[in-house]
Amino acid sequence: MAVGYVDCHCHMTAEEFSQDTEEVIEESKENGIQALISVTEHGGEFEKLIYLSDRYPDYIMPCFGIHPIQSNGDGQRSVTIKDLEPVLAQFDKYKDSLVAIGEIGLDFTPWLAPTSEQREEQMKVFQMQLEMAKRMDLPVNVHSRSAGRQTVSFLKEQGAEKVLLHNFAGRPSAAQEGVQAGYFFSFPPAVIRNEQRKKLIKMIPLENICLETDSPSLGPKKEDRNVPSNIRLSCEYIASVKGLMPERVREVTTLNALRLFPKVSCKLQK
């Protein structure tokens, strides 16, 4: 039996999927995807994600997390403790259903988190969620935009072991530090339009790479909605950069995902 894909980071509760969730999931299955690991950005998505994972058991694999950047009306702002505290009980309520904690991390984009106070609060929110993951023995699904080195260093300081650095765009030296710590890195279909990622992908061993789409964002065309079935584009691009067959990349990245997310592995073996 051929090994299918695992999309290690997508957003199935996004508004962009609200009208055709079933069609998107069927298309994913038809394109050989074994599991969708779906993350959240804020507490308002938690119940919706549990509903979806109950509706599509052993296919949509839920992760709870509070993202470092939050929506603020029609804009965006840096996360605060107040975004996390009211939903802490939800993590415990659904801990048996969760396969990871995410999307969590740091985002030091200058116009979103310009002050040291904002960045310190992001780190506190990140730390609290890392501690929760450790207590629940769950991996973490991590965001690190404009903070690659700081994120890897902080993860190591906190003793995080099961880590996916999604859509990593930090320096190769920071990636190397993550590889040495045993962390995994995933890349969405948008890498096909970003030459700068080629160096990173070439440097990171295949044994430390997973596949993701970050759907509905980061697709092959910036203006189009991304969908999980585009995962093959990530796979084919990584294969071309590394001079490997796509089948080999699919097989190894799926095995990596099942090692990193043991609860996903258990669900797929039912």
From Swiss-Prot:
Zn(2+) 2 binds at E103, H143, H166. GO terms for molecular function: metal ion binding; nuclease activity. Its EC number is 3.1.21.-. The 3'-exonuclease activity is sensitive to the metal ion present in the active site, whereas the AP endodeoxyribonuclease activity is observed in a variety of divalent metal cofactors. 3'-exoxonuclease activity is suppressed in the presence of Ca(2+), Zn(2+) and Ni(2+). It is an enzyme of class 3 (hydrolase). It is found in: Nucleus. Binds 2 Zn(2+) per subunit. Exhibits AP endonuclease and 3'-exonuclease activities in the presence of Mg(2+) and Mn(2+). In contrast, in the presence of Ca(2+), shows AP endonuclease activity exclusively. Its main location: nucleus. Keywords: Hydrolase, Metal-binding, Nuclease, Nucleus, Zinc. Zn(2+) 1 binds at H9, H11, E103, D214. The keyword Zinc applies. One of its GO terms (cellular component) is nucleus. Its cofactor is Mn(2+); Ca(2+); Mg(2+); Zn(2+). The keyword Nuclease applies. Belongs to the metallo-dependent hydrolases superfamily. TatD-type hydrolase family. Exhibits 3'-exonuclease activities and apurinic/apyrimidinic (AP) endonuclease (in vitro). Show preferential AP endonuclease activity on double-stranded DNA substrates and 3'- exonuclease activity on single-stranded DNA. This is Putative deoxyribonuclease tatdn3-A. The lineage of its organism: Eukaryota, Metazoa, Chordata, Craniata, Vertebrata.
